[in-house]
Amino acid sequence: MDRNTLFSILLNNFGFTPTEGQAKVLYHLSAFILTEKERPLYLLRGYAGTGKTTLVSTLVKTLPQIGMRYQLLAPTGRAAKVMSSYTGKPASTLHRKLYRFQAVANGELRMTRDVNKHKNTVFIVDECSMISDQGDGYSWSRSLLDDLIEYVFSGSCCKLLLIGDSAQLPPVGLDISPAMDFDILRNSFNLTIATYEMKEVMRQALESGILHNATEIRNKIAMSNEQWAMSDFDGYELPLLNINNFDDIIKIDPMSFEELLWQSFGDKRSNNDAVVICRSNKRANMFNQAIRSRVLQEEGELSAGDKLMVVKNNYFWTSQQDNETTRQQVAETQRRRVAESQSTINNPFQSPSPFQSPSPIPNISFIANGDMIEIMKINKFEELYGFHFADVEIQLMDYEDAPSLSVKILLETLHSDSPALTNDEAKRLYQAVEEDYMDIPKASDRRKAMKENPYFNALQVKYGYALTCHKTQGGQWNNVFVEAPYLPEETILELGDLRWLYTAITRASEKVYLVNFKDEWFM
């Protein structure tokens, strides 16, 4: 097949007349898919509303038609769920795809990068602005970006498509998003690389107040980047936002705010379609307490039905737990999918492509930072080692068919103003647990035994109703309440403020409610 033929297939599958930028990307993709060069990577950057998701859906539809496979990946479970929603196909998190447990000589399970057994496969990764090139302290990982690239290109005839928006917040602790930076990718990895940035927002998208304001902020970020590079950026002065004649981005007063919180969070069965985005963990704690006490009318620290976010990767509960319920649920899911597959085979009008990537049973090898969970049942509360714990049954909310798990959670992080346990708190817990193992004389044996302690491995969580902007990144909610960012100088916005606000308002699919924004913000 030649490039022009594939381009025609892509255009036909696109379904309507593409914008100039979309047409260019489709033409680039036709070359990218067919290239036989070593380690091919295509970096697709784009503003919100430029149609990146439509392009991905078109590619996913086209690849099986030409005998190629694909894998859909994203940094978090929420981002993978969004990707699966707009493509109609299963998507996985990067961590669940890249890593696995491996037994080492002493019988201990250790995390390691998995082997890429895929052939002739395009790995499509969304929300790449979240991917860091910094190590996270684990000996088995250089960095998520390193591991992703080396995993993909260790397979036979595999290609990598990175998609994202460079205007969003970079990974915590970084000034830029390395996976969105052409020069970093080109200089740090041995790649055949091409890139394109989509800037033309679709006309119908600009009818949305959310995307209208996002585009204006995005343009100011681009301008600020140029000035910052020349050391000529002193901040951007308010006003910034235009909410006139739009019904999807609204400034609200305190009374309306409380009423809208009731509407959004009052029913535990459906309150996972809204989020409050805050400027700090301290502010998120305040909003979470208010929502639980005044809206949900919860008096206890934890209740069945509570939605929580995991704030630190946890490898203990899924690797150590001999969970018969889990095995039965996975087996039942497998039987159901086999039955569905047989039904499809027997129906000539539903013949699937032999090249379509299969819908995988969820990989529950660990519980990831950023995973949303729901408390299904509370078995007991207890206090030990100077900390408070709860034994609970949880459901992973962002993974279809994921089995329930029995875990122990640490309650201190629910109210902490830090992202997770502080270093001092973690040290205090470690030392308290270690006291129970001092009869083991050898330090290495003692540490190994401590790794099996359920209290030491308790899941660190926060309430999931109000979150910091970084914690919402990659996710999407119907209704998003955005608290005004803190400005030391009341009318001057730094580049980071622009990125923060851009990321926050683009989390909404239907409505943005602006909370505590002064009149100076508005045109």
Regions from the PLM with identified roles:
Residues 137, 326, 342-348, 352-360:
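Intrinsically disordered, low-complexity proline-rich tandem-repeat tracts
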